[in-house]
Amino acid sequence: MHLRILGSAAGGRFPQWNCGCANCAGVRGNAGKNTGQHAFPGKARTQAQLALSADGISWFLAGASPDLASQIESTPALHPRARRDSPIAGVVLASADLDHVLGLLLLRELQPLRVYAAPSILRILREENSMFSMLNRADPQVIWTPIKSAAPFPLQDVAGNDLALCYELYPLGGRYPKYVRTKDLPPQDATSALFFTSKSVTSKTSKRIGYLPAVGKLDDALLSKLEGLDVLLLDGTFWSDDELSRLDPTAERAHQMGHISVEESLRLLKNINVRRRIYIHINNTNPILNEAGPEHRAVRDAGWEIAEDNWYLEL
């Protein structure tokens, strides 16, 4: 399986346009300067975005970030192969959060795609937001595909061809975005974990990736789902539960926003059997972005990696 991390920051990217915290001010000060001893020891990041493929030819996106256009341009594997073409076969959605779906509108140029999500997420996009009708100006353009079963589901292109890649939606619950007006949506579908499985034609072995950019808690059932993964990409939004409230007393705590803290997940997953453990969806205030800081060292010493834009993993 081929995995490309196109973006690794939480919503608002890093640096965030209206933030002057120590992290943002530091990385912003690096722009246009030669790296020196006074430079901020960290890297700018675009908003979290994955691309996955079984063969390195046809790709599926996990989410559709607001930075998607520039992320595609910086990734030659996702460039057109003909005058009007895209190797992107479709998109898999974990939620209706703006930083997870706005990039769909950047894919409106009449390119056939398949979009997979829980029925409630598709309902929000198709019935509550007229802008997304721009994705259905031609036939075929976007094929909206609801996933109701928790069983692994084969991903297909718009022609119905299986692409040797399966995925599974694992409901995490939580809350729907504040812009959602519909009140009768099932709470369990607000956020999902995404699990991808690929089988190699030559080795007959399966590879599994788990993508959880927003998870509020790690219960026993979820912990068992994570066991044995080849790659785990986990919610790294906040270092501590009170990260934002220490900066602004009126701000919510991490768990109230549906995010487990890195401090807590490090403890709970200390003995997890996962080949590679990577934190992603990192908020601009998170001290792990400072590569010289104790929090960054604590994560690395625990055997975890901290995702950066443009990483490529081949399993």
Tell me what each language-model feature is.
Residues 1-77, 81, 146-225, 311-315:
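Core dinuclear metal-dependent hydrolase active-site scaffold
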Residues 15, 71-73, 102-104, 126-127, ...:
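Short glycine-/acidic-enriched loop or helix-start segments at secondary-structure transitions
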Residues 107-133, 138-144:
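Long, hydrophobic, well-ordered secondary-structure blocks that form the structural core
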Residues 2, 112-114, 143, 166, ...:
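Residues at the starts of beta-strands that form the adenosine-phosphate
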